[in-house]
Amino acid sequence: MSVAPLNLPWATAERAQATSRVLGEPEWLLTERMDAFERLGRLPTEPNQLFTPYLDLRSVSFGAVTPIEPFASAEAGGEAGPEALPEGAAALISVGPDGRVHVSLGDTARAIGLVAWTFGDILATRPELVRPIIEAGRTVPEDDAFGQAARALASVGIFIHVPAGAALADPIVLRWTAGKAGKALLSRTVLSLGEAAQALVFEEQVGSDGSVGTGDAGSEAEAATAQWWGTTEIDLAAGAVLEFTGEQDFGPDTAAFASRRARLARDASVAWAIASVGGRLHRSRVDNELDGRGATVRQVEIGFGDGRQLFDLTSYTRHIGQDTTSDLLSKGVFTGRSRGYIKGMIEIARSAKGTDTFLGEFSMLLERTARSVTIPSLEIDQPDVRRAMHSSSVGPIDETQVFYLMSRGLSRDAARRAIVLGFLEPVVARIPLPAAQDRLRALLERKWPSGSRGQESGSPGGSRAA
C-alpha cells in the first residue's frame, strides 16, 4: 500500500474541473488543479522508503465518503459580527462542516491592512497577492500525495496576508469544524507575510458534534466515517516572523490529513507548536524549506493517543541557505491500543554552509498494549556545519522521576500524571489564547488512563542518539 498511489474513488479529473467551474476560478488555477491531479495519480502514498513500513491506513475507507460540494459564491459564508471574535483575538476565520466560511476582523487587524478571505474573493479583487505564491505548485511538496489531493480537489480556499512591516500582537484564529458523516472536507490555506511582518496564527480543529477526541469508539476493523484534508501553505518574505500554533481535537470517527509547508526567505523565522489529541487517525506532515540566509525554524509537535487512535507525525526540513537554524522536537504519549509513528528527515544541501540543526523524537508508552516508533534521519551534503544531530527514544515513564515525586508526597498516579503533562507542556504553553490553553490542558487530563490502567508498559523500542 505504501508504495502504491492513493486510491481515492472520488478523485477524478471531472470533479476537479467541476469544482473549479463552480467556484469561478481563472484558467491558471484550473491548470494548477489538473497538475495536482496528474501528480496524485503517479505519486506513492509514502514517498520515503525509510518510512514505508510505518504507514497504516486500515482505519480509513476512502470510498465511504464524498467531498463536500463547493459554494457557488463566497457570500454564502457571509461575515460574522465583531462579537464573534474570541477574546484576545485579532481576527477569526471560521469554516463549518459544510464548508461555509465566516470572517471577522477586529479593529487592529483592519488598521494594519490584514487580508483574510476566501480564494474566490481574493482572486476577484487582488489576484496579484495569490498567483505569484501558489502558481506552479510552489507551496505544496511535490512528493506529498495527500497535499496534492487537497490542491487538486479543495472546495474551500482561505488566503491570509499580513502586509510588509505590519505587526499583529494578537492571534489570527483559524477554526475548522469537521466530522460530517460520509463527507470529506478538502481545503487549502495560504498564509503570506510581507517583509519584516509579524503575526501569530492559532488553528483550532474541532468535531462537528462536540464529541471528545478520543479513540475509544469502534473496533479496529471499523473505518472512520468522516475525513478532513487540508494544506497550510506559508510564504515568509525577508525578516518576517510567524508563530503558528495548532490544536486538533476532531471527533472519534474522523480521519485527518494535514499537510503544512513553510518557505522562508532571508532572516525569516517560523515557530510551530502543534498538538493533536482527537480523531481516529491523524496524519500530519510539516515541511520547512529554509531558502534564505539566516532563516530559522523552531518546531514542537505532540500527540496523545488512546483507544485505537493512530498518530502519524512526519517532518521534513531542508536547509538550502547559509547560516540557517532548525530545532525540531516531536513528542507522543500513547495508552490503550493506540499507536504513534514519529518520523523526521533533515536535509542539508551543499549550499547550506553554517547550518545548525537538531531533531528530537520521543514517545512515552503508558500501557503494554500501546506502540510507537521514532525514526529521525539526517542527509548531509555539506560538511561545514555548526551542528547536525538527532536523538530519539521510546519507552515507559522514567521510574526514577516517579520515585522522586512520590518522595515529595504525590501518589503514584499523581506522579505519573504530572510527568506526562509536563512532557507535553512545551506545546500547551505556546498556545496564544489563555482559554484555548486551558481547554487543551483539560483535553490532555481527560485522556489520562482511568483507574489503575496506567501501569508500567513494555517498550518495543529503545533509545538512540546521533
Where are these regions (language model features)?
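Short, low-complexity, intrinsically disordered N-terminal peptides in bacterial proteins
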Residues: 1-11, 456-466
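Short arginine-rich
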Residues: 41-50, 423-433
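Conserved beta-strand/loop scaffold segments within soluble protein domains that form the structured core
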Residues: 22, 104, 116-410, 424, ...
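N-terminal amphipathic, basic helical "cap/leader" segment at the start of enzyme domains
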Residues: 2-148, 329
